[in-house]
Regions:
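Active-site-flanking segments in enzyme catalytic domains
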Residues: 1-36, 59-169
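Zn2+-dependent metallopeptidase catalytic core
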Residues: 34-63
Length: 169
């Protein structure tokens, strides 16, 4: 992370993060030292405020209205430094997760969260982007139409008739 500090040099705790952003829970692995926990809490705090600045949202939106949990240094997956666990609605980062991992996983969480408002027949573990790719029926709403336009720009070629090179990889 190369951005400005949002803490003015002060240390924050994971409890501070939970309270301020409204996360449902925060779990820290038992093998995480106190020093690692402090460094991580400060980095999480700054990364979450970077996301707030970029998206022009407030603290409560970052936790998707209190529906998200965080895990650090626990419950990892082989070959993954970070992942979003949809059944738990949990952002999980390993101790060695790199810069940008939190934002990347947050967008998976948002994709999952928004599906309940995006789709006419939502399912608990369905993601909006996949449902859109599968031509699922959408709830008619101006924001949903804008999101569908974004998906078209991200996933289809210039004329909108086929998957783009990124999707095909």
């Amino acid at each position: 992370r190369n951005g400005q500090s949002h803490r003015d040099g002060a240390d924050v705790s994971f409890q501070d993060i939970r309270r301020l952003f409204g996360f449902q829970s925060i779990t820290v692995g038992r093998w995480v030292t106190a020093a690692e926990q402090q460094i991580a809490a400060n980095l999480f705090f700054d990364a979450l405020y970077d996301l707030i600045d970029i998206l022009q949202i407030n603290e409560r939106v970052v936790s998707l209205n209190g529906s998200l949990s965080l895990a650090f240094g626990t419950g990892g997956q082989k070959h993954a430094n970070a992942h979003y666990h949809s059944a738990k609605r949990q952002l999980a980062l390993a101790k060695n997760a790199g810069g940008g991992a939190l934002a990347h996983e947050w967008f998976h969480a948002f994709d999952h969260y928004i599906s309940q408002r995006f789709l006419s027949a939502p399912k608990p573990l369905l993601f909006a982007s996949q449902a859109w790719l599968d031509d699922a029926e959408l709830v008619e709403h101006p924001l949903n139409l804008r999101l569908a336009d974004c998906f078209q720009l991200m996933f289809l070629d210039a004329d909108g008739s086929a998957p783009n090179d990124y999707v095909l990889r």
